Amino acid sequence: MNIAIRNPVPVRREEGSLQVGLDPNDRIETAKVFAVYGKGGIGKSTTSSNLSVAFSKLGKRVLQIGCDPKHDSTFTLTKRLAPTVIDALEAVNFHSEELRAEDFVVEGYNGVKCVEAGGPPAGTGCGGYVVGQTVKLLKEHHLLEDTDVVVFDVLGDVVCGGFASPLQHADRALIVTANDFDSIFAMNRIVAAIHTKSKNYGVRLGGVIANRSAKTDEIDRFNAAVGLRRLAHFPDLDVVRRSRLKKSTLFEMEPTPELKAVTDEYMQLAETLWAGADPCEAVPMKDRDLFEFLGFD
């Protein structure tokens, strides 16, 4: 079968926006699927990669899919920038039947399988369509049949129909946020996007992961107001910065008491998600209401 990267056909209208439709044959039915969202630069790739390792240490077979054209989601797992699905397809002139799994799947730390979807050239095409074709390619190669957990690491806080496409595959959406105005403002917009998607797909909000924050008071106040819950809290430690520079996950860094507390938190998060976190029925605030709600400390 040939996979051609072309502009998607808008097949569904939801609240006035055109969305990229999901072929029922492309649903991921053999694994628990999590989509990780959050403000750009908040640490989604760090969170996703360490969460993937935690799942693997529970004995689960894990696949992490990076959905950013920068293709830097998985480098702490693989120790290199993995080739993207788009790169692999271009190399065979988009004749996907000529690809082998090793052309676009890299095994990382502790057996976590890593895929970087990549994206079309800047200013062209639809990144969400690329994500859909990545899932289709994985199914063609039967790579999802031996997978227990799929983690989508999604570009920034983009919630257009295209980059919301991982929500079509996900069971639970997780939002990474810091304890500040900009991160929570972005989180509210993501909640709105997930609220919209949940009307037509099975995705539900799983909860919030507090990251790079000494405190969580503003996060917790917002969660209580809209119907979210905090699943985990990761403080802003220098070991996180150093792990990125060493191209390593936190589980590979020199152990210290504070680092053990963080890796234990990741293990607890993985256990909670695997056990089946109840969905959050959150209702987003209007932008102006949120503006008045936050801050003033």
Swiss-Prot record:
User: Mind telling me which PROSITE patterns this protein's record contains?
Assistant: NIFH_FRXC_1, NIFH_FRXC_2, NIFH_FRXC_3
Cofactor binding note: Binds 1 [4Fe-4S] cluster per dimer.
- What residues bind Mg(2+), as annotated? S45
Which co-factors does it depend on?
Answer: [4Fe-4S] cluster
Q: What GO molecular function annotation could you give as one example from this UniProt entry?
A: oxidoreductase activity, acting on iron-sulfur proteins as donors
Kindly give the NCBIfam families that the UniProt entry links to this protein: DPOR_bchL
Q: What is this protein called?
A: Light-independent protochlorophyllide reductase iron-sulfur ATP-binding protein
Query: Native species of this protein?
Result: Methylorubrum extorquens (strain CM4 / NCIMB 13688) (Methylobacterium extorquens)
- Give the classification, highest ranks: Bacteria, Pseudomonadati, Pseudomonadota, Alphaproteobacteria, Hyphomicrobiales
